[in-house]
């Protein structure tokens, strides 16, 4: 399907450009193989909702290592956005409660899971401190669908914001949700 802009550097073709590229190559291949042109149906994929999603994280610890880098740990990670770990997906972020200020530092955004859990390798963001809200853009396509209870972490809530309103459309999972299907054998209880 058609891609989206995850970062300001991403170049995404228009629908017409994408169709022209795919169709011209497909027609060339069919012709060179002596085949009739096939009927091609493409799904729009992430282009419908990808850019509409923004994930908000609360900043936990900010660790500044002079001469090396600054790490910003957040209250999410691999369980709510596995794409950086699985595909090397790249995202951009802003400190939401300071979005009106210019970027001030380069940081690495780390998730809360026990293994290498890096959400963003290099983010140019506003000055950041514990308790800030970090907004990560273009998370509307696959984040929720790919989220999991990895390491027994509950999934976050999903809020629909439109026309000046914010409405809860998926509630945050609770401890009860996490253990709802667990069974303790009688001899162990």
Regions found by a protein language model. Give the residues of each.
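Active-site-proximal beta-alpha loop/turn segments in soluble metabolic enzymes
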Residues: 1-14, 44-48
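Alpha-helix-loop-beta-strand connector modules within alpha/beta enzyme cores
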Residues: 18-31
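Charged (often Lys/Glu-rich) extended helix/loop segments that serve as interaction or gating elements
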Residues: 21, 35-189
């Amino acid at each position: 399907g058609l891609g989206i802009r995850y970062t300001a550097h991403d170049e995404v073709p228009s629908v017409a450009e994408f169709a022209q590229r795919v169709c011209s190559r497909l027609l060339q291949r069919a012709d060179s193989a002596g085949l009739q042109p096939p009927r091609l149906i493409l799904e729009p994929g992430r282009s419908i909702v990808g850019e509409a999603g923004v994930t908000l994280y609360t900043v936990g610890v900010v660790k500044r290592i002079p001469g090396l880098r600054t790490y910003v740990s957040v209250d999410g990670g691999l369980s709510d956005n596995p794409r950086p770990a699985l595909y090397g997906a790249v995202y951009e972020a802003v400190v939401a409660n300071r979005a009106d200020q210019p970027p001030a530092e380069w940081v690495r955004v780390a998730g809360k899971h026990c293994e290498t859990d890096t959400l963003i390798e290099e983010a140019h963001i506003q000055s950041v401190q514990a308790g800030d809200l970090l907004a990560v853009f273009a998370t509307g396509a696959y984040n929720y669908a790919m989220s999991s209870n990895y390491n027994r972490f509950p999934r976050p809530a999903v809020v629909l914001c439109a026309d000046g309103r914010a409405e809860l459309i998926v509630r945050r999972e609770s401890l009860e949700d996490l253990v709802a299907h667990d069974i303790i054998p009688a001899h162990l209880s």
